[in-house]
Amino acid sequence: NVSSQYISALLMIAPILSNGLTLTLTGEIISRPYINLTLQLMNDFGARAKWLNEYQLKVEPQPYQSIPFYVESDWSAASYWYQIAALSNKAEIILPGLFETSYQGDSKVAEIFQLLGIESIYGNKMVTLKKTDKIAERLDYDFINQPDLAQTFVVTCALMNIPFRFSGLQSLKIKETDRITALIKEMGKLGYILHEIDDRI
């Protein structure tokens, strides 16, 4: 319940282990979509990896295979373009390399930003962002599966004067820095007061 990165690391080395690997997870599983992304890409490259049940994963001893592969753009990075669109009076932004049906859990950003007035129009390996006037009066969301998006939405909602309550943020404290503390400190410089309660802001 600390970070899915440790799980992904073990999964990715498992195909080259002589007996493969079976992982049994305990406690609350955070960032599950990131684990699913790891499994999907492993299978794309010839591994045999899957969930056995809600808490157990199994990887067979089978080496990876080299295949042609199109690397999708990063939905986490795309969140900042969504933010720019949301904070603009008018916006039409084209982001290449993003798919409507994506392995990435952070592709959820399109659905959440729709609540903040940003429409996502999908084309051939691209998405176009357009500003609309359909904006929620308040935003409540559990980021347990997309923690890396939380900072973008905290800043966006604050600058748009939209009240919010976000939960599922416990993993943000053990990133490259304590992102919660940094967020509270930096937003305070702009005059915003954020309240941290357990895993919520």
Summary of predicted features, one role per range:
Residues N1-I201:
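Short, structured segments at the rim of ligand-binding sites
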